[in-house]
Amino acid sequence: DEVMATLMTNSRTPALAELDLRAQVAAAGVVRRRMTELFDKYGAQIVVDVMADSLRDSEIMLRNRIRALPDGVWKTEEHVDHDGHSDSLTTIRLTLTKSGDTLIFDFTDSDDEAAGLINCTRPTLESGPFSAVLTHLCAGMTWNEGIMDRIRIDSRPGSIVDCNFPAPVASGVINSGWAALDASAAAVARMMLDGQESRKLTMAGWAGAPYGVNIFGKRENGRSFATMLGLSGLQGGGARSFADGYDAAGYLHSPRCGAMNVETAEARFPILHLFRRLAPDSGGA
Protein backbone atom coordinates (compact mmCIF):
# COMPACT_ATOMS: atom_id res chain seq x y z
CA ASP A 1 0.00 0.00 0.00
CA GLU A 2 2.89 2.38 0.72
CA VAL A 3 4.41 1.72 -2.70
CA MET A 4 1.03 2.21 -4.36
CA ALA A 5 0.48 5.47 -2.50
CA THR A 6 3.89 6.75 -3.61
CA LEU A 7 3.18 5.91 -7.24
CA MET A 8 -0.26 7.48 -7.19
CA THR A 9 1.05 10.67 -5.59
CA ASN A 10 3.15 11.15 -8.72
CA SER A 11 0.25 10.65 -11.14
CA ARG A 12 -2.09 13.33 -12.49
CA THR A 13 -4.83 10.68 -12.84
CA PRO A 14 -4.36 8.52 -9.74
CA ALA A 15 -7.74 6.77 -9.97
CA LEU A 16 -7.05 5.49 -13.49
CA ALA A 17 -3.41 4.73 -12.78
CA GLU A 18 -4.22 2.70 -9.66
CA LEU A 19 -6.90 0.71 -11.49
CA ASP A 20 -4.47 -0.06 -14.32
CA LEU A 21 -1.67 -1.09 -11.97
CA ARG A 22 -3.91 -3.30 -9.85
CA ALA A 23 -5.19 -4.97 -13.03
CA GLN A 24 -1.60 -5.78 -14.03
CA VAL A 25 -0.88 -7.23 -10.59
CA ALA A 26 -4.06 -9.33 -10.80
CA ALA A 27 -3.10 -10.59 -14.26
CA ALA A 28 0.32 -11.64 -12.99
CA GLY A 29 -1.42 -13.53 -10.20
CA VAL A 30 -3.57 -15.41 -12.72
CA VAL A 31 -0.49 -16.39 -14.73
CA ARG A 32 1.21 -17.67 -11.60
CA ARG A 33 -1.85 -19.70 -10.62
CA ARG A 34 -2.27 -21.21 -14.09
CA MET A 35 1.41 -22.14 -14.30
CA THR A 36 1.21 -23.79 -10.89
CA GLU A 37 -1.79 -25.79 -12.10
CA LEU A 38 0.18 -26.98 -15.14
CA PHE A 39 3.12 -28.05 -12.99
CA ASP A 40 0.81 -29.89 -10.61
CA LYS A 41 -1.03 -31.67 -13.43
CA TYR A 42 1.86 -32.68 -15.70
CA GLY A 43 4.99 -32.26 -13.61
CA ALA A 44 7.59 -29.54 -13.91
CA GLN A 45 9.91 -31.45 -16.24
CA ILE A 46 7.23 -32.13 -18.86
CA VAL A 47 6.11 -28.50 -18.86
CA VAL A 48 9.69 -27.26 -19.22
CA ASP A 49 10.39 -29.78 -22.02
CA VAL A 50 7.29 -28.71 -23.95
CA MET A 51 8.34 -25.06 -23.67
CA ALA A 52 11.83 -25.92 -24.94
CA ASP A 53 10.36 -27.92 -27.84
CA SER A 54 8.15 -24.97 -28.81
CA LEU A 55 11.16 -22.64 -28.91
CA ARG A 56 13.18 -25.13 -30.94
CA ASP A 57 10.35 -25.79 -33.42
CA SER A 58 9.93 -22.09 -34.15
CA GLU A 59 13.67 -21.64 -34.62
CA ILE A 60 13.85 -24.56 -37.07
CA MET A 61 10.84 -23.39 -39.09
CA LEU A 62 12.20 -19.86 -39.42
CA ARG A 63 15.65 -21.17 -40.31
CA ASN A 64 14.15 -23.11 -43.23
CA ARG A 65 12.19 -20.08 -44.43
CA ILE A 66 15.26 -17.84 -44.30
CA ARG A 67 17.30 -20.39 -46.27
CA ALA A 68 14.73 -20.21 -49.07
CA LEU A 69 15.34 -16.46 -49.45
CA PRO A 70 18.17 -15.06 -51.60
CA ASP A 71 21.41 -13.99 -49.93
CA GLY A 72 22.08 -10.29 -50.19
CA VAL A 73 22.27 -6.84 -48.59
CA TRP A 74 19.46 -4.29 -48.33
CA LYS A 75 19.62 -0.74 -46.93
CA THR A 76 16.80 1.40 -45.54
CA GLU A 77 16.44 4.72 -43.70
CA GLU A 78 13.76 6.21 -41.48
CA HIS A 79 13.61 9.66 -39.90
CA VAL A 80 12.32 11.34 -36.76
CA ASP A 81 11.54 14.97 -37.55
CA HIS A 82 11.73 16.68 -34.15
CA ASP A 83 13.36 15.86 -30.82
CA GLY A 84 11.39 18.32 -28.71
CA HIS A 85 14.25 20.83 -28.75
CA SER A 86 15.16 21.46 -32.38
CA ASP A 87 13.31 21.07 -35.67
CA SER A 88 15.86 18.80 -37.34
CA LEU A 89 15.87 15.32 -38.85
CA THR A 90 17.37 12.42 -36.94
CA THR A 91 18.05 9.41 -39.14
CA ILE A 92 17.91 5.70 -38.35
CA ARG A 93 19.99 3.75 -40.88
CA LEU A 94 19.74 0.00 -41.31
CA THR A 95 21.72 -2.50 -43.34
CA LEU A 96 20.08 -5.93 -43.51
CA THR A 97 22.32 -8.83 -44.51
CA LYS A 98 20.92 -12.27 -45.24
CA SER A 99 23.50 -15.06 -45.28
CA GLY A 100 22.46 -18.70 -45.25
CA ASP A 101 19.98 -19.13 -42.41
CA THR A 102 20.75 -15.91 -40.52
CA LEU A 103 19.50 -12.33 -40.71
CA ILE A 104 21.79 -9.52 -39.52
CA PHE A 105 20.21 -6.13 -38.78
CA ASP A 106 22.97 -3.50 -38.53
CA PHE A 107 21.96 -0.10 -37.10
CA THR A 108 25.49 1.14 -36.32
CA ASP A 109 25.35 3.99 -38.88
CA SER A 110 22.34 5.61 -37.20
CA ASP A 111 22.67 9.17 -35.90
CA ASP A 112 23.92 9.96 -32.40
CA GLU A 113 21.49 10.19 -29.50
CA ALA A 114 19.40 13.35 -29.37
CA ALA A 115 19.02 16.02 -26.72
CA GLY A 116 15.28 15.40 -26.55
CA LEU A 117 13.12 12.48 -25.51
CA ILE A 118 13.10 10.55 -28.82
CA ASN A 119 15.98 8.18 -27.99
CA CYS A 120 15.43 4.48 -27.37
CA THR A 121 17.38 1.83 -25.51
CA ARG A 122 18.74 -1.45 -26.83
CA PRO A 123 15.72 -3.57 -25.71
CA THR A 124 13.35 -1.25 -27.58
CA LEU A 125 15.56 -1.44 -30.66
CA GLU A 126 15.50 -5.25 -30.58
CA SER A 127 11.71 -5.26 -30.77
CA GLY A 128 11.85 -3.67 -34.24
CA PRO A 129 13.57 -6.44 -36.23
CA PHE A 130 11.80 -9.07 -34.12
CA SER A 131 8.36 -7.64 -34.96
CA ALA A 132 9.19 -7.24 -38.65
CA VAL A 133 10.37 -10.84 -38.95
CA LEU A 134 7.37 -12.19 -37.04
CA THR A 135 4.88 -10.39 -39.27
CA HIS A 136 6.57 -11.03 -42.63
CA LEU A 137 8.14 -14.47 -42.24
CA CYS A 138 6.40 -16.32 -39.42
CA ALA A 139 2.82 -16.91 -40.58
CA GLY A 140 1.47 -20.19 -39.24
CA MET A 141 4.22 -20.48 -36.66
CA THR A 142 4.24 -20.14 -32.89
CA TRP A 143 5.60 -16.67 -32.12
CA ASN A 144 8.18 -17.02 -29.37
CA GLU A 145 11.78 -16.24 -28.44
CA GLY A 146 13.15 -19.18 -30.44
CA ILE A 147 12.84 -16.99 -33.52
CA MET A 148 15.49 -14.64 -32.11
CA ASP A 149 18.13 -17.34 -32.56
CA ARG A 150 18.05 -16.63 -36.31
CA ILE A 151 18.44 -12.86 -35.87
CA ARG A 152 21.50 -10.78 -35.01
CA ILE A 153 21.15 -7.10 -34.20
CA ASP A 154 24.17 -4.77 -34.26
CA SER A 155 24.02 -1.28 -32.80
CA ARG A 156 26.33 1.47 -31.57
CA PRO A 157 26.09 2.57 -27.93
CA GLY A 158 25.44 6.29 -27.80
CA SER A 159 23.32 6.28 -30.94
CA ILE A 160 19.67 7.27 -31.28
CA VAL A 161 18.62 3.60 -31.16
CA ASP A 162 21.02 2.48 -28.40
CA CYS A 163 21.38 5.49 -26.14
CA ASN A 164 23.44 5.78 -22.99
CA PHE A 165 22.18 6.90 -19.59
CA PRO A 166 21.01 9.60 -18.89
CA ALA A 167 19.72 10.27 -22.41
CA PRO A 168 15.96 11.05 -22.33
CA VAL A 169 13.79 8.18 -23.58
CA ALA A 170 10.21 9.05 -22.55
CA SER A 171 9.00 9.01 -26.17
CA GLY A 172 11.56 6.58 -27.54
CA VAL A 173 9.15 3.72 -28.21
CA ILE A 174 6.98 5.75 -30.59
CA ASN A 175 9.84 7.74 -32.16
CA SER A 176 13.25 6.14 -32.77
CA GLY A 177 11.97 2.73 -31.67
CA TRP A 178 9.11 2.87 -34.14
CA ALA A 179 11.43 4.15 -36.86
CA ALA A 180 13.65 1.10 -36.25
CA LEU A 181 10.58 -1.09 -36.72
CA ASP A 182 9.65 0.67 -39.97
CA ALA A 183 13.21 0.40 -41.28
CA SER A 184 13.30 -3.30 -40.39
CA ALA A 185 9.96 -3.98 -42.09
CA ALA A 186 11.04 -2.14 -45.25
CA ALA A 187 14.32 -4.07 -45.41
CA VAL A 188 12.61 -7.44 -44.92
CA ALA A 189 10.05 -6.55 -47.60
CA ARG A 190 12.80 -5.65 -50.07
CA MET A 191 14.54 -8.92 -49.33
CA MET A 192 11.31 -10.82 -49.97
CA LEU A 193 10.83 -9.00 -53.29
CA ASP A 194 14.04 -10.60 -54.52
CA GLY A 195 12.75 -14.12 -53.86
CA GLN A 196 10.69 -16.06 -56.39
CA GLU A 197 8.17 -17.47 -53.91
CA SER A 198 8.33 -14.79 -51.22
CA ARG A 199 7.59 -11.93 -53.63
CA LYS A 200 3.85 -12.61 -53.61
CA LEU A 201 3.77 -12.30 -49.79
CA THR A 202 5.50 -8.91 -49.65
CA MET A 203 3.83 -5.93 -47.98
CA ALA A 204 4.48 -2.22 -48.28
CA GLY A 205 5.08 -0.22 -45.14
CA TRP A 206 2.25 0.30 -42.68
CA ALA A 207 1.51 3.63 -41.03
CA GLY A 208 4.83 5.29 -40.27
CA ALA A 209 4.15 6.06 -36.61
CA PRO A 210 1.43 5.95 -33.98
CA TYR A 211 -0.32 9.05 -32.80
CA GLY A 212 -2.49 9.89 -29.86
CA VAL A 213 -4.87 12.75 -29.14
CA ASN A 214 -4.09 13.85 -25.59
CA ILE A 215 -6.95 15.64 -23.87
CA PHE A 216 -7.21 17.05 -20.37
CA GLY A 217 -9.21 19.55 -18.36
CA LYS A 218 -11.84 19.72 -15.65
CA ARG A 219 -15.24 18.09 -15.43
CA GLU A 220 -18.42 19.94 -14.48
CA ASN A 221 -17.87 18.88 -10.87
CA GLY A 222 -14.41 20.47 -10.87
CA ARG A 223 -12.44 17.21 -10.87
CA SER A 224 -9.56 16.91 -13.30
CA PHE A 225 -9.50 14.42 -16.15
CA ALA A 226 -6.89 13.37 -18.69
CA THR A 227 -6.62 10.63 -21.27
CA MET A 228 -5.21 9.69 -24.65
CA LEU A 229 -7.56 8.75 -27.46
CA GLY A 230 -5.49 6.04 -29.14
CA LEU A 231 -6.94 6.51 -32.60
CA SER A 232 -3.83 5.28 -34.40
CA GLY A 233 -5.00 1.72 -33.77
CA LEU A 234 -7.33 2.37 -36.72
CA GLN A 235 -4.54 3.05 -39.25
CA GLY A 236 -4.36 1.13 -42.51
CA GLY A 237 -2.16 -1.87 -43.24
CA GLY A 238 0.51 -1.91 -45.94
CA ALA A 239 -0.49 -2.68 -49.52
CA ARG A 240 0.15 -6.25 -50.64
CA SER A 241 1.32 -7.59 -54.00
CA PHE A 242 -2.20 -8.74 -54.85
CA ALA A 243 -4.46 -6.22 -53.08
CA ASP A 244 -4.68 -3.00 -51.09
CA GLY A 245 -3.79 -3.05 -47.43
CA TYR A 246 -6.46 -3.75 -44.85
CA ASP A 247 -8.57 -0.81 -43.69
CA ALA A 248 -8.22 0.03 -39.99
CA ALA A 249 -5.63 -2.70 -39.60
CA GLY A 250 -3.84 -1.54 -36.46
CA TYR A 251 -0.06 -1.68 -36.16
CA LEU A 252 2.44 -3.89 -37.97
CA HIS A 253 3.46 -5.52 -34.69
CA SER A 254 -0.09 -5.55 -33.28
CA PRO A 255 -2.67 -6.09 -36.03
CA ARG A 256 -6.34 -5.41 -35.31
CA CYS A 257 -5.61 -3.66 -32.02
CA GLY A 258 -8.54 -1.25 -32.46
CA ALA A 259 -9.39 1.94 -30.59
CA MET A 260 -11.81 3.14 -27.93
CA ASN A 261 -15.44 3.30 -29.05
CA VAL A 262 -16.81 6.80 -29.57
CA GLU A 263 -19.66 6.05 -27.17
CA THR A 264 -17.26 4.82 -24.50
CA ALA A 265 -15.06 7.90 -24.80
CA GLU A 266 -18.04 10.24 -24.54
CA ALA A 267 -19.42 8.34 -21.54
CA ARG A 268 -16.14 8.52 -19.64
CA PHE A 269 -14.94 12.01 -20.55
CA PRO A 270 -16.60 15.40 -21.23
CA ILE A 271 -15.97 15.29 -24.98
CA LEU A 272 -18.13 15.17 -28.12
CA HIS A 273 -17.24 13.43 -31.39
CA LEU A 274 -18.71 15.03 -34.50
CA PHE A 275 -17.54 12.09 -36.63
CA ARG A 276 -14.92 9.38 -37.02
CA ARG A 277 -14.12 8.50 -40.63
CA LEU A 278 -11.55 6.66 -42.71
CA ALA A 279 -9.59 8.85 -45.14
CA PRO A 280 -9.52 7.26 -48.64
CA ASP A 281 -6.11 6.33 -50.04
CA SER A 282 -4.26 7.21 -46.84
CA GLY A 283 -1.91 4.94 -44.88
CA GLY A 284 -2.20 1.38 -46.13
CA ALA A 285 -3.53 2.32 -49.57
What are these model-derived regions, one by one?
Residues 1-285:
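Glycine/proline-enriched, intrinsically flexible loops and inter-domain linkers
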